[in-house]
Amino acid sequence: MWLGVVTLFPEMFRAVTDFGVTGRAVSKGLLELQTWNPRDFTHDKHKTVDDRPYGGGPGMLMMVQPLRDAIHAAKAAAGKEAKVIYLSPQGRKLTQQGVEELAKSSSLVLVCGRYEGVDERIIQTEVDEEWSIGDYVLSGGELPAMTLIDSVSRLVPGVLGKQASAEQDSFSDGLLDCPHYTRPESLDGLDVPAVLLSGNHEHIRRWRLQQSLGRTLLRRPELLENLALTGEQEKLLADFVDTIKQDD
């Protein structure tokens, strides 16, 4: 997968290219990431990339010309039709479903805003989609872009050691992940659930599914509203609720 990032702080993306899952993906050639700095497309000695907004008001906006030229350079480097994404709190909220949609693209150009944002005409003429990682304000689009890159790259074939790792992640099936345990078997009086030590794969599968359903009900009940549960899932969830009531 090819990713181009338009940013005033390209050095921030070493966190993506040099570390962890994404770093390994880059080193294996499964993920290619290039950056373009609008400052490199300026025509004045100060490398100015911001300007005052028409109508007044606080803050500055990113200038049109350097940003647009950087986007064009990124699209040209893609060598194919690349989808241009602007990271914005006004965009569609990124969910696992959205991540799966984006992962189907072979190339993406991510535009990271700074200051008070970008000229609306850039969005109208250069941007295909706007995406948000949540209803809060950040200093720029770099962290949202890195979040998007990390989540999308996990779905690129070969990036994770086992595809099952991606399939078992929270939200991969619309549910939160189940609890996980490793050694020791007992920690400060808290024991690993016996079913996980049983070696019975079917019992373990059902326990994990039930815990995933129950955790979603307790922590993110709105997620269940959008799911059509199977008969097995409904039974496991009902048993989970009964167990909670008995414990109370």
UniProtKB/Swiss-Prot annotation:
Keyword Transferase: yes
SUPFAM superfamilies, per database record: alpha/beta knot
Keyword tRNA processing listed: yes
Alphabetical GO biological process terms: tRNA N1-guanine methylation
EC annotation from Swiss-Prot or TrEMBL: 2.1.1.228
Domain of life the protein comes from: Bacteria
Uppermost EC category: transferase
Keywords: Cytoplasm, Methyltransferase, S-adenosyl-L-methionine, Transferase, tRNA processing
Amino-acid positions noted as binding S-adenosyl-L-methionine in the UniProt annotation, renumbered to this chain: 113, 133-138
Disulfide bridge map: none
Catalyzed chemical reaction(s): guanosine(37) in tRNA + S-adenosyl-L-methionine = N(1)-methylguanosine(37) in tRNA + S-adenosyl-L-homocysteine + H(+)
Pfam families for this protein: tRNA_m1G_MT (PF01746)
Gene Ontology CC terms: cytosol
GO MF assignments: tRNA (guanine(37)-N1)-methyltransferase activity
Protein's cellular compartments: Cytoplasm
Quaternary structure and interacting proteins, as annotated: Homodimer.
Similarity remark: Belongs to the RNA methyltransferase TrmD family.
Protein role: Specifically methylates guanosine-37 in various tRNAs.
Protein name: tRNA (guanine-N(1)-)-methyltransferase
Gene (UniProt): trmD
